[in-house]
Curated annotation (Swiss-Prot):
Keyword RNA-binding: yes
Protein name per UniProt: Large ribosomal subunit protein uL5
Cellular component aspect of the GO annotation: ribonucleoprotein complex; ribosome
Subunit structure comment from the entry: Part of the 50S ribosomal subunit; part of the 5S rRNA/L5/L18/L25 subcomplex. Contacts the 5S rRNA and the P site tRNA. Forms a bridge to the 30S subunit in the 70S ribosome.
Keywords: Ribonucleoprotein, Ribosomal protein, RNA-binding, rRNA-binding, tRNA-binding
Source organism per UniProt: Clostridium botulinum (strain Loch Maree / Type A3)
Assigned protein family: Belongs to the universal ribosomal protein uL5 family.
Domain of life: Bacteria
Length: 180
């Protein structure tokens, strides 16, 4: 079965974007390529259990096993050595990506306290969008009494759009609640 958001993209968003930007070919229309969710766990250098808990949380949220991210080089001031695991990340594509985007837009973001929309300034100039989340509790899979610590995460939407304007419209049509 096709995810709800993918169906919406194919049925409504493609034609809306073609009208708005005047694309000649359907293959020119920007689409979501992947979503990368990254959790940096600073205290992992002293406490490996913290990293395991973060990996478990991220696996619950995304339904996919995260890979560990390691330090590129040693930094004495931060007390880190090269190849020391310091976080975890998941790359979602295809169906999993649409399922996650749907859950983020329609379930998780509305649960954020004092939520007034996501910033429309977090585009990188190449049509990718980044959003930071302060706590993992906004996702329904995380049980409040089972977590050891509140952790945040970065979520990056990678699109095939050439410009930020095209990417913004793509995400807006998919339902991303941008702040006015």
């Amino acid at each position: 079965m096709m995810p709800r958001l993918q169906e919406k993209y194919e049925k409504e968003v493609v034609s809306a974007l073609m009208d708005k930007f005047g694309y000649k070919n359907i293959m020119e229309v920007p689409k979501l390529e992947k979503i990368v969710i990254n959790m940096g766990v600073g205290e992992a250098k002293e406490n490996q259990k913290a990293l395991e808990a973060a990996v478990e949380d991220l696996a619950k949220i995304t339904g996919q096993k995260p890979i560990l991210t390691k330090a590129k080089k040693s930094v004495a001031n931060f007390k880190i050595r090269e190849n020391m695991p310091l976080g975890c990340k998941v790359t979602l594509r295809k169906q999993n990506m649409y399922e996650f985007a749907d859950k983020l837009i329609n379930v998780a973001l509305p649960r954020v306290r004092d939520f007034s929309g996501v910033s429309s300034k977090s585009f990188d100039g190449r049509g990718n969008y980044a959003i930071g989340i302060k706590e993992q509790l906004i996702f329904p899979e995380i049980e409040f009494d089972k977590i050891d610590k509140i952790r945040g995460m970065d979520i990056i939407f990678v699109t095939t759009a050439k410009t930020d304007e095209e990417a913004r419209e793509l995400l807006r049509f998919l339902g991303m609640p941008f702040a006015r």
